């Protein structure tokens, strides 16, 4: 019992000593609570708190970090009275909030107050930052040539330290985390395929992964660009392609510019003073012949080759020059004047391009019974001939030609002698031994006059040809301006003997694939059997004309579809012909069929233009027909029976195409045609594809597509199936039901995908049968498997058509006269209001009346035109829209 009181006594003494020590440490300080310590990860939120008790008015608490005042600190101060008299004693609590903790927030924090002229500072609290590594630098995307070294950078920091980096290529680690050093820079010797790189930062808290950088491998710069052969109008160049990794080269682009004065100023720069013209060529071979160039003309060329990953860097500009050519025309104004035994011959330099450096002139003269004599005159343009001998020279004529290092140019027409006239200048004495002259035996003035007339005709023809050549080619006709896709067109002039070429030679000259040529051989038609008529429609790249095809026993009225090959690229030519051969396999009353293909010579270039021969469609395309029936000068009413028949025809044609494993991809009312029997034919197979394996087709290249008609899965993944055409058919049904309205009015093309993903669909048209709209809605199911087949659609539409009553003339017709003064009439009667329209006076009535069908949903009033607007039943013909009465 004696030991226990002793232990309590010792403990009480120790507590008293400690309390005395704390009182000394905190003597006079008002702080009763000091800031604590915070350790957190980057981005977290922390709070520091301090408390003090004071007598009298509460002071303002200021926060310090590392001894510096925090001017913009997010702190709150709370004051609580402790005594009954609020002026006696106060408790003050200050809280500092640190949001989104960063490395700069770490340090020592204290509270500071000023009381009675003294400054008091609390005990410090510490804020530390510890968490996952933070990236200061991440790898960036790059495009590098194949097998070319490059560097990537990545840098991260803690705390806590140390931070080590691990590089990954295509999600595979390149090296393990070892040691305490970070590999900030990755040096790669080169790649042969496009790869992705990222880095991982490791510390004691865990791992952070950087962004993924894509390194695209491009072909190396081509090298050894050189000239293989030179001609006056041709250059053959070759080059060695650079490495392209695992991606084969698809094509090369050749740029060429004329070397104007001052070319040396921009030769070392990337861009010349004017935009160069670009020619795209397929490879291999890595060789190209440039034709139709200007003789004796300097050019600069460079080359870049492309793979599926992108283009290589351009080579340096290479100066090249064509060789000299012969002069294009003879010397001008050749004259030969006789003065006794001397003949003075004069001429002027050719006005047309010399195509080289003029080296001199050659002169030839001969008489009626004497051989021709050739002389090299040099660069002079005047020479005197002295005729000697016993025999006179009868009917002497003179011709002159200019020559360059490439040879002689054209000779001038033979010029007869003229008598000497005073004032012609002093002749040069170039003596030539000849027999003595004798008088001409017949009047030579007539010969001179005829020669002058002939020379004038030749001169006019030569000037016309030269002017045409200058106008058509600055670069010699090898290059043409760019077209919409950015490709360049190679144009050339063939001989006028094109009409004698065989079909095989014509196909070979087009530069198309062997597979397409094989298909075209089966559908070729003799060009002379086709007669062209008026133009039905014309666009930027082609036209449709009315024509006649002479068959063995009859003449068939056809539509002829042509292409302006002078402004189209080779790929567009192949697309045009592929659409034609696509139709040769079709044999169905509701599918456009192909009659044949032929080629005609271009009047301007002589290059064969493709011509596709199709059946003649009297009423044009379905969309225009529907639109003009509603908005044309003479609107007509289309009964529901006719609209349903249009839908059934299209469904029947698409059912046939689906059985042939064809995907249309561009089904719309504009691509359906109406023949003379008002039957619809599915047409325009420019985007159609035949699927040989499986039941879908994935589009490889980005092409212009009608997004408002495309199925939602095709917009997302560019995957097309027969059920994608079913979606488009539903939109086409909506077009027909609305008489040609545009789908999704008010919705931009760029917004269609999001609009459909939200579950939105086309609304039910006015006066559309509920069953028809339900059929449309089934075509727009999100899951393609839930959509009906074309066989089901055709059957449902045919049953709907059978269930409808026969089309008859409307029982209730409303006639409204809309004269110039009709604008003051009350509109509510005509719009379906309670009051009927006032009956006009018969004497003021216009003889031009418009019939409007009255439905249960409301009445329609159509403004009159110069002739009454008839109603159209399913078994009656319908006038075509203006400008569309004929067409394919």
UniProtKB/Swiss-Prot annotation:
Name of the top EC class for this enzyme: transferase
Gene3D superfamilies in the record: Immunoglobulins (2.60.40.10), Phosphorylase Kinase, domain 1 (3.30.200.20), Transferase(Phosphotransferase) domain 1 (1.10.510.10)
Region (Interaction with GAS6): 19-86
One record GO biological process: ovulation cycle
Domain Protein kinase: 530-801
Modified residues (Phosphotyrosine): 697, 773, 815, 860
Extracellular side: 19-445
Positions annotated as active site in the UniProt record: 666
GO molecular function: ATP binding; phosphatidylserine binding; transmembrane receptor protein tyrosine kinase activity; virus receptor activity
Leader peptide range in chain numbering: 1-18
Membrane-topology annotation of the record: Single-pass type I membrane protein
Compartment annotation: Cell membrane
Cytoplasmic membrane side: 467-888
Post-translational modification as stated in the protein's UniProt record: Monoubiquitinated upon GAS6-binding. A very small proportion of the receptor could be subjected to polyubiquitination in a very transient fashion.
Annotated InterPro entries: FN3_dom, FN3_sf, Ig-like_dom, Ig-like_dom_sf, Ig-like_fold, Ig_sub, Kinase-like_dom_sf, Prot_kinase_dom
Pfam families according to UniProt: fn3 (PF00041), Ig_2 (PF13895), Ig_3 (PF13927), PK_Tyr_Ser-Thr (PF07714)
One cellular component (GO) term of this entry: plasma membrane
Protein's job: Receptor tyrosine kinase that transduces signals from the extracellular matrix into the cytoplasm by binding growth factor GAS6 and which is thus regulating many physiological processes including cell survival, cell proliferation, migration and differentiation. Ligand binding at the cell surface induces dimerization and autophosphorylation of AXL. Following activation by ligand, AXL binds and induces tyrosine phosphorylation of PI3-kinase subunits PIK3R1, PIK3R2 and PIK3R3; but also GRB2, PLCG1, LCK and PTPN11. Other downstream substrate candidates for AXL are CBL, NCK2, SOCS1 and TNS2.
Self-association and partners: Heterodimer and heterotetramer with ligand GAS6. Interacts with CBL, GRB2, LCK, NCK2, PIK3R1, PIK3R2, PIK3R3, PLCG1, SOCS1 and TNS2. Part of a complex including AXL, TNK2 and GRB2, in which GRB2 promotes AXL recruitment by TNK2.
Protein name listed in UniProt: Tyrosine-protein kinase receptor UFO
Organism: Mus musculus
The organism's taxonomic lineage, starting at the top: Eukaryota, Metazoa, Chordata, Craniata, Vertebrata
């Amino acid at each position: 019992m004696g030991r226990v009181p002793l232990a309590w006594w010792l403990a009480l003494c120790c507590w008293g000593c400690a309390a005395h020590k704390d009182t000394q440490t905190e003597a006079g300080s008002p702080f009763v609570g000091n800031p604590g310590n915070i350790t957190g990860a980057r981005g977290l939120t922390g709070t520091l708190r301090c408390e003090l008790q004071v007598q009298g008015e509460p002071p303002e608490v200021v926060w310090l970090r590392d001894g510096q005042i925090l001017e913009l600190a997010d702190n709150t101060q709370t004051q609580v009275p402790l005594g009954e008299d609020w002026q006696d004693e106060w408790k003050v609590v200050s809280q500092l909030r640190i949001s989104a903790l960063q490395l700069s927030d770490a340090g020592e924090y204290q509270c500071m107050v000023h009381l009675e002229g003294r400054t008091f500072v609390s005990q410090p609290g510490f804020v530390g930052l510890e968490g996952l590594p933070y990236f200061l630098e991440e790898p960036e995307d790059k495009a590098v040539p194949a097998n070319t070294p490059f560097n990537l950078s990545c840098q991260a920091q803690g705390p806590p330290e140390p931070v080590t980096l691990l590089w990954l290529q295509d999600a595979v680690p390149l090296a393990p985390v070892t040691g305490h050093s970070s590999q900030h820079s990755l040096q790669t010797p080169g790649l042969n395929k496009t790869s992705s790189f990222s880095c991982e930062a490791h510390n004691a808290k865990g791992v952070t992964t950087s962004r993924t950088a894509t390194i695209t491998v491009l072909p190396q710069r081509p090298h050894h660009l050189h000239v293989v052969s030179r001609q006056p109008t041709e250059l053959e160049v070759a080059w060695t392609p650079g490495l392209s990794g695992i991606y084969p080269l698809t094509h090369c682009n050749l740029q060429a510019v004329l070397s104007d004065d001052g070319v040396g100023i921009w030769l070392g720069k990337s861009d010349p003073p004017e935009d160069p013209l670009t020619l795209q060529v397929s490879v291999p071979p890595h060789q190209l012949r440039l034709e139709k160039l200007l003789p004796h003309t300097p050019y600069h060329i460079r080359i870049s080759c492309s793979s599926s990953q992108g283009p290589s860097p351009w080579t340096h500009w290479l100066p090249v020059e064509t060789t000299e050519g012969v002069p294009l025309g003879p010397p001008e104004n050749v004259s030969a004047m006789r003065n006794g035994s001397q003949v003075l011959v004069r001429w002027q330099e050719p006005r047309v391009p010399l195509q080289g450096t003029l080296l001199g002139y050659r002169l030839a003269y001969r008489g009626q019974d004497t051989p021709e004599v050739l002389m090299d005159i040099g660069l002079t343009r005047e020479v005197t001939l002295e005729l000697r001998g016993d025999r006179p020279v009868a009917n002497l004529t003179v011709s002159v030609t200019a020559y360059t290092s490439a040879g002689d140019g054209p000779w001038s027409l033979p010029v007869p002698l003229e008598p000497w006239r005073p004032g012609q200048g002093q002749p040069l004495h170039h003596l030539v031994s000849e027999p003595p002259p004798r008088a001409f035996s017949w009047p030579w003035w007539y010969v001179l006059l005829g020669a002058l007339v002939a020379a004038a005709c030749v001169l006019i023809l030569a000037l016309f040809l030269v002017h045409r050549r200058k106008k058509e080619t600055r670069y010699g006709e090898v290059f043409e301006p760019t077209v919409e896709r950015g490709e360049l067109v190679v144009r050339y002039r063939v001989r006028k003997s094109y009409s004698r070429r065989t079909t095989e030679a014509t196909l070979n000259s087009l530069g198309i694939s062997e597979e397409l040529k094989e298909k075209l051989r089966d559908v070729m038609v003799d060009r002379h059997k086709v007669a062209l008529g008026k133009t039905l429609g014309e666009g930027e790249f082609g036209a449709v004309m009315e024509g006649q095809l002479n068959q063995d026993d009859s003449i068939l009225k056809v539509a002829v579809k042509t292409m302006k090959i002078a402004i189209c690229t080779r790929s567009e030519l192949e697309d045009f012909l592929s659409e034609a051969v696509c139709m040769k396999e079709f044999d169905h009353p509701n599918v456009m069929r192909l009659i044949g293909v032929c080629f005609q010579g271009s009047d301007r270039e002589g290059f064969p233009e493709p011509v596709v021969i199709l059946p003649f469609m009297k009423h044009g395309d379905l969309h225009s027909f529907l639109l003009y029936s509603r908005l044309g000068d003479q609107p007509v009413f289309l009964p529901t029976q006719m609209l349903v028949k249009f839908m059934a025809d299209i469904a029947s044609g698409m059912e046939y195409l689906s059985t042939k494993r064809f995907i249309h991809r561009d089904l719309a009312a504009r691509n359906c045609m109406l023949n003379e029997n008002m039957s619809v034919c599915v047409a325009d197979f420019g985007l159609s594809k035949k699927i040989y394996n499986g039941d879908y087709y994935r589009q490889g290249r980005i092409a212009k597509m009608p997004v408002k008609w495309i199925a939602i899965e095709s917009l997302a993944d560019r995957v097309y199936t027969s059920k994608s055409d079913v979606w488009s058919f539903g939109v086409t049904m909506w077009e027909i039901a609305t008489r040609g309205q545009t789908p999704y009015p008010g919705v931009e093309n760029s917004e269609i995908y999001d609009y459909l993903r939200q579950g939105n669909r086309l609304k039910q048209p006015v006066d559309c049968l509920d069953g028809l709209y339900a059929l449309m809605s089934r075509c727009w199911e999100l899951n393609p498997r839930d959509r009906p087949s074309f066989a089901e659609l055709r059957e449902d539409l045919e049953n709907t058509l059978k269930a409808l009553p026969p089309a008859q003339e409307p029982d209730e017709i409303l006639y409204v006269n809309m004269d110039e003064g009709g604008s003051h009439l009350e509109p509510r009667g005509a719009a379906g209001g309670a009051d009927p329209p006032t009956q006009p006076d018969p004497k003021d009535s216009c003889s031009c009346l418009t019939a409007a069908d009255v439905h249960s949903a409301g009445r329609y009033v159509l403004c009159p035109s110069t002739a009454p607007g008839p109603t159209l039943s399913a078994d009656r013909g319908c006038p075509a829209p203006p400008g569309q009465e004929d067409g394919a």
